[in-house]
Amino acid sequence: SKNVNDTKWLANFFAKYLKKGDIITLNGELGSGKTVFLNGIASYFNIEKDVCSPTFTIVNEYNINKDYPIYHFDVYRIKDSEEFLDDIGTEYFEDGICLIEWGDEIIQDILPKATIHIDIQKDNSDINTRYFKIWRKK
C-alpha cells in the first residue's frame, strides 16, 4: 500500500472473508501499520470508534451486530505462550474473530494451524509504503 487509505482499503476487502473462529496474526515492527490495518477491518464491521492497541489490557472486545464478537489482542507485553495461557487462555479462539498483534513473535506455538498470518513490512525508500504478505501454514 502507498498510504493509510490504501491500507484501510486492503483490510476492508480482506475483512469480507472473515468468519467466526478465524484467527489472524498481524506481524511487523512498531509503526508498520498493524493498527491501521485493524481499523480497516473495524470499518468493514461498522465499528465506529477508532481501534487502538490494547497493549496494557491485552484484549479488547468489539460487538459487530452478529452472533459473535471481534477480539483484538496485543501480546507485545506477554512474555510467552505459557503466560498467555495462564492469563488469557484459548477460549476466545473459537468464540469470535481473533485479531492478534505480535502473535507470531510471542504465541506462535499455541496458534491453530489454520491461523491466517499477515506480515507487514515497511519500504526502506518510502516512509508511507507498506508490503503485505497474507499466508497460512500448509
Segments from the language model and where they lie:
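The conserved Walker
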Residues: L30
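Post-Walker A helix-loop "phosphate-sensing" segment adjacent to the P-loop in P-loop NTPases
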Residues: S43-C52, I64-D67
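Short phosphate-coordinating micro-motif centered on Lys-Gly-acidic
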Residues: S43, E82-E83, T90-K138
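Hydrophobic anchor at the beta1->P-loop junction of P-loop NTPases
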Residues: I24-L26
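Conserved nucleotide-sensing/catalytic segment adjacent to the nucleotide-binding pocket
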Residues: T55, E61-W102
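Conserved lysine of the Walker
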Residues: K34
